[in-house]
Amino acid sequence: MINVDPPTGNYPATGGNSTHNITSESDSRLAFKVKSSNNEHYRVRPVYGFVDAKGKSKLDINRLPGPPKEDKIVIQYAEVPAEETDPMAPFKAGAQQGEIIVKLIAA
């Protein structure tokens, strides 16, 4: 129900930034949550957010200096009603519907 463009993040081991677009293919509004396999070297903003039906949301990833390594982020998503104001709420309630994995490569 969502796509991420670009689907992979490539960074120098000395650090770097990338911006990705989360695009919804759903007719419903979605909430998302981003989980990282390496919180020591990656910062992601936003961690929680919304994507409107057939809409887009921007995701910024910052790679801090560190050893070359392959990591990933997992973007979990769930349908939410239009009036939902807290993007964390569906995940606290265990409402995850699907997920997509984005590879992060530092070389």
Swiss-Prot record:
The UniProt annotation puts the region (Disordered) at 1-26
> Per its UniProt record, what PANTHER family does this chain match?
MAJOR SPERM PROTEIN (PTHR22947), MSP DOMAIN-CONTAINING PROTEIN-RELATED (PTHR22947:SF37)
Provide the MSP domain boundaries: 1-107
Q: Where is the composition biased (Polar residues)?
A: 15-25
Gene that specifies this protein: ssp-34
Give the tissue specificity: Expressed at higher level in testis.
Stored Pfam families: Motile_Sperm (PF00635)
Q: What is this protein called?
A: Sperm-specific class P protein 34
